[in-house]
């Protein structure tokens, strides 16, 4: 074999090795992500833990970087993932209601994650997200974490909220209005001061994590039972999703399903933990008679569905068929 031929073979081998290395590097998918709450909070931690698991398990196939909290308002994250400014977002459905109004109806869900996967709901939601949000819908978690009414110092005997000024979000706007409350919408950062000054008499919030915001120092009562359920969605920009190969896509979907089922069970324990924590902070529970409790829940779901069906009369009935139940 001539020296010239050897040099040619060596050069070809080097080129092939370089090409292989480049292909291997290109195969690793890197995604930038944003969460609606910081990683250390009760609602931010499950997402951060899931990302950590992905980065550790995927062996260089997928790497997700959570961008600094506060770098973008949660209410603009839906538009950001739609346009591709960010690859992945973790946020409640109500925060991108401008893009997908019916998404907020997830609060009314009465099915388990496994039931929703089996009855075609995930496919239904994914199609809507593909069309309206330019996103792949991995799923959601938090559906069995209830919301409650928290009151500063006014104890109520019935589900009559007339004369009470309550801080709201779109999640429970229709419900609180149906019970006669005066509605006030302010950012979470302003809630402590509003409670302290009496600008609001209370607010709606999930059972988790009022302590992180210091609200437990201002709140004396929690109304039981809870109503609705939180719903935190995981979305991936659709154009970015299509750059992933089939194995990467399947891995992300399976990993999220595992997390979804795990958090469904874990939430049951954490609901009890946070209820105990609130009691230790001196927060008392308000309970109604069985008849009043039944009316309270009936109004919650009827008001919620009435609003949802008005927002999207086309997709609303199908949504109700897939996630609805008897309170």
List where the protein language model places each region:
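Bacterial N-terminal signal peptides that target proteins for export
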Residues: 1-10
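Hydrophobic helical h-region of N-terminal Sec-dependent signal peptides
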Residues: 10-15, 20
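N-terminal secretory/targeting leader peptides
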Residues: 11-13, 26-111, 115, 121, ...
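Sec/Tat signal peptide C-region and signal peptidase I cleavage site
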Residues: 20-26
């Amino acid at each position: 074999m001539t020296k010239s031929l050897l040099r040619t073979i060596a050069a070809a081998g080097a080129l092939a090795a370089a090409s292989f290395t480049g292909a291997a590097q290109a195969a690793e998918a890197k995604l930038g992500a944003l969460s609606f709450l910081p990683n250390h909070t009760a609602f931010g931690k499950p997402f951060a833990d899931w990302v950590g698991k992905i980065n550790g398990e995927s062996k260089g196939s997928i790497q997700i970087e959570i961008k600094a909290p506060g770098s973008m308002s949660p209410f603009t994250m839906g538009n950001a993932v739609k346009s591709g400014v960010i690859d992945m977002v973790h946020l409640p459905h109500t925060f991108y209601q401008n893009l997908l109004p019916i998404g907020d109806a997830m609060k009314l869900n009465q099915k388990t994650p496994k039931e929703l996967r089996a009855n075609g709901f995930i496919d239904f939601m994914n199609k809507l997200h593909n069309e309206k949000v330019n996103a792949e819908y991995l799923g959601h978690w938090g559906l069995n974490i209830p919301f409650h009414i928290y009151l500063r110092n006014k104890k109520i005997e019935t589900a009559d909220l007339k004369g009470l000024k309550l801080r709201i979000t779109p999640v429970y706007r229709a419900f609180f209005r149906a019970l006669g409350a005066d509605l006030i919408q302010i950012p979470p950062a302003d809630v402590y001061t509003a409670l302290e000054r009496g600008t609001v008499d209370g607010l709606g919030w999930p059972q988790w994590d009022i302590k992180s915001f210091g609200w437990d120092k201002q709140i004396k009562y929690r109304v039981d039972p809870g109503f609705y359920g939180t719903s935190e969605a995981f979305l991936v920009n659709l154009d970015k999703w299509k750059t992933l190969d089939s194995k990467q896509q399947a891995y992300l979907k399976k990993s999220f399903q595992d997390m979804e089922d795990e958090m469904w069970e874990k939430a049951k324990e954490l609901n009890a933990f946070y209820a105990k924590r609130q009691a230790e902070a001196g927060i008392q529970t308000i309970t109604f008679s069985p008849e009043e409790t039944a009316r309270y829940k009936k109004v919650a779901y009827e008001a919620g569905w009435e609003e949802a069906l008005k927002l999207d009369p086309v997709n609303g009935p199908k949504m109700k068929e897939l996630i609805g139940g008897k309170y």
